[in-house]
């Protein structure tokens, strides 16, 4: 409402549309009205005094239990929303330093040339650049200011919902090791063990005993009498050993032996290299190869003074290039090539006269010439003599012709600067312009300068600036005082290597240098002309330089077979061969003698447990244990609390006494005798 009245007053007073500042002020007032209507915002001064009362006051929630009414009709479309608040400074895109320097350079150009056209100023305003209040400078919209101070303390909120069940806590530290347990009962006797291994064979039969003495002669035959038989005499000496017994039978076949240990790898180590074989029989001579086609031209090396010798063939295709020859031997410390013949003179230039060039610039004014010689005196005119011989002067003659225009004088000195003129009258306000196009943001969402802005600056704004700057340079513009030197810019990236420039002009001839060292000997000269003075031959000259390497000759015939070579050294032993196949099964051996009795085997493993015995008599109950720890607290349901009501069963926070409570006594009265809850419990003791 306030915004509407404000707009009406503005329209009545000015008769025009609202300006941007009035519109923003109207939106701010509307926002305050809406906030005051929707929320009861207490005054700022009394927020601390009434904070406790507001916190204690609590509205009744869910007090209305009526069913919801039918949905209403859709309301009219509301007014356009208010502009959003500016983003905090830490969420705004940051402009890189290079982009800031680019904008600052443009602003400096605008500051330097202030008298610009109106079309340029409109485009500058579209890019966020504004004139200063006095109209003498151009300003750039600055960065947003720091965040304002913190607002007053808000009202105390309603109690929050209970949080969800927490996660399991971390695993505790390991406990102390327990005491050693009592010794267990002895287990049952295990089954008999497996038979032990077969014993070793006993020692062979010992040596024969010594032969005893011959028997004594027999005594006389006794007579049977009635005499009593005396006690037995002492044992006689041992008798001679009897004859050796026969060999016993072969013993039974023994049990199968235990499996042996795993053998080594089937593939043995690599053997030594064998001896090299003898050289083979030399092969027979091969057939001669076909002759190649003749080449076209073979140029030889150049002789002194550029004379070359060549051999040209009339027919034949060019053969393949031969292999490179051996490098030549140079006997001089530095090989210098022979200077070639002079080149063919070029064609003479064209004699056609080209078109006449453009007229040259006007030359400067020449110096003033010297003063000419004085002319001869003129002839005196005819004078009339009157009265005493005096000459009478006649009437003045007609005016003479205009003289020649004088020469231009020298340029005068600069005059003093005039006073500043009075300000002109204020012009009438112009007509309202058309609505401009949508502006372009200076900074892109990613924090860099907008590419569309760069294109507009290059295509539209920069050409206009260049034209106006070129016009201002020709006028009498008095430059202002030089500004302070700016900070040193960052080093730019190294540019790509440029193209090679044209060859420069020959330099000036330098001073004559010092005498150099003696050079190497020159090449041999041409042979001199033979003189016919006599048959005497001159002295023999020095040997010439080695000639160029000759061409490679044809392939020679294959050589004779060589003699057989000597016997080579023994080679390294070869690798071990693969394991051979299994042999055939051998014949069954003879039955061996019976072996001695084996030793008792080791104790066998423990047998399986026996069947469960009969249950024993129940023991006496143990002593009462210690009191347990406190239980885990109950879980809170994640739901809002309901309104406070009458006490209900199992929901009241007040503990109830089972003997004195009225509700408990009524419940017990309604229950039958069999379902009544016993008040005491008895424990059976043995």
UniProtKB/Swiss-Prot annotation:
One of its GO terms (cellular component) is extracellular matrix. The keyword Transferase does not apply. Keywords: Collagen, Cuticle, Disulfide bond, Glycoprotein, Repeat, Signal. This is Putative cuticle collagen 99. Nematode cuticles are composed largely of collagen-like proteins. The cuticle functions both as an exoskeleton and as a barrier to protect the worm from its environment. The keyword Repeat applies. Residues 246-256, 361-373, 401-417 have a biased composition (Basic and acidic residues). Residues 67-79, 231-243, 540-549 have a biased composition (Pro residues). Transmembrane segments: none annotated. Residues 142-201, 230-263, 268-296, 394-439, 479-536, 538-576, 577-636 are annotated as: Triple-helical region. Belongs to the cuticular collagen family. InterPro entries: Collagen (IPR008160), Collagen_superfamily (IPR050149). Pfam families: Collagen (PF01391). Glycans are attached at residues 446, 535. Residues 42-79, 163-444, 475-650 are annotated as: Disordered.
């Amino acid at each position: 409402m306030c915004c509407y009245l404000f707009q009406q007053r503005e329209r009545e007073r000015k008769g025009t549309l609202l300006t941007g500042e009035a519109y923003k002020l109207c939106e701010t007032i509307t926002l305050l009205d809406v906030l005051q209507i929707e929320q009861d915002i207490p005054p700022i001064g009394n927020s601390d005094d009434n904070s406790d009362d507001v916190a204690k006051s609590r509205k009744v929630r869910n007090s209305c239990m009526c069913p919801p009414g039918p949905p209403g009709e859709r309301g009219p479309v509301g007014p356009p929303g208010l502009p959003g608040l500016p983003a905090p400074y830490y969420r705004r895109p940051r402009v890189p330093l290079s982009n800031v320097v680019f904008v600052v350079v443009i602003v400096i150009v605008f500051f330097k040339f202030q008298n610009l056209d109106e079309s340029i100023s409109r485009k500058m305003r579209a890019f966020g650049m504004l004139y200063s209040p006095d109209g003498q400078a151009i300003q750039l919209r600055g960065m947003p200011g720091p965040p304002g101070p913190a607002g007053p303390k808000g009202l105390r909120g309603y109690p929050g919902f209970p949080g969800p069940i927490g996660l399991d806590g971390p695993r505790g530290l390991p406990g102390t090791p327990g005491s050693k347990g009592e010794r267990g009962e002895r287990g049952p006797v295990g089954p008999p063990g497996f038979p032990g291994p077969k014993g070793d064979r006993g020692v062979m039969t010992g040596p024969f005993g010594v032969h005893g003495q011959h028997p004594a002669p027999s005594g006389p035959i006794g007579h049977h009498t009635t005499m009593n038989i005396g006690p037995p005499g002492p044992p006689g000496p041992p008798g001679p050993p009897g004859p050796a017994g026969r060999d016993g039978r072969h013993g039974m076949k023994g049990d199968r032996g235990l499996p042996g240990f795993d053998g080594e790898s089937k593939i043995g180590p690599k053997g030594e290299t064998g001896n090299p074989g003898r050289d083979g029989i030399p092969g027979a001579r091969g057939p001669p190869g076909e002759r190649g086609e003749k080449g076209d031209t073979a140029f030889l090396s150049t002789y002194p003074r550029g004379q070359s010798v060549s051999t040209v063939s009339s027919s034949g295709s060019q053969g393949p290039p031969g292999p490179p020859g051996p490098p030549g031997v140079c006997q001089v410390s530095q090989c210098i090539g022979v200077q070639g013949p002079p080149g063919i003179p070029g064609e003479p230039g064209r004699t056609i006269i080209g078109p006449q060039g453009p007229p040259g610039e006007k030359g400067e004014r020449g110096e003033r010439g010297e003063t000419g010689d004085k002319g001869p005196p003129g002839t005196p005119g005819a004078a009339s003599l009157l009265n005493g011989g005096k000459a009478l002067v006649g009437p003045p003659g007609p005016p003479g012709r205009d003289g020649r225009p004088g020469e231009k004088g020298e340029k005068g000195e600069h005059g003093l600067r005039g006073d500043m003129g009075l300000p002109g009258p204020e012009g009438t306000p112009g007509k309202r312009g058309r609505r401009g196009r949508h502006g372009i943001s200076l900074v892109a969402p990613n924090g860099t300068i907008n590419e569309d802005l760069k294109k507009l600056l290059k295509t539209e704004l920069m050409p206009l600036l260049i034209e106006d700057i070129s016009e201002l340079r020709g006028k009498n513009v008095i430059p202002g005082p030089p500004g302070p030197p700016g900070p040193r810019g960052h080093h730019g990236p190294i540019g790509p290597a440029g193209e090679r420039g044209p060859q420069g002009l020959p330099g000036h001839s330098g001073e004559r240098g010092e005498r150099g060292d003696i050079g190497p000997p020159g090449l041999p000269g041409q042979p001199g002309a033979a003189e016919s003075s006599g048959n005497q031959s001159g002295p023999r000259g020095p040997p010439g330089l080695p000639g160029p390497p000759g061409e490679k000759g044809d392939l020679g015939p294959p050589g004779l077979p060589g003699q057989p070579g000597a016997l080579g050294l023994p080679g390294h032993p070869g690798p071990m061969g693969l394991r051979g196949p299994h042999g055939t099964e051998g014949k069954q051996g003879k039955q061996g003698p019976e072996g001695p009795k084996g030793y008792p085997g080791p104790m066998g493993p423990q047998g399986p447990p026996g069947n469960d015995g009969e249950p024993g008599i129940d023991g006496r109950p143990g002593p009462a244990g210690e009191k347990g720890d406190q239980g885990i607290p109950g879980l809170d349901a994640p739901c809002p609390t309901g309104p406070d009501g009458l006490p209900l069963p199992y929901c009241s926070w007040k503990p109830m006494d089972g003997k004195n409570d009225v509700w408990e006594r009524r419940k017990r009265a309604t229950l039958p005798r069999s379902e009544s809850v016993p008040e005491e419990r008895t424990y059976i003791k043995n």
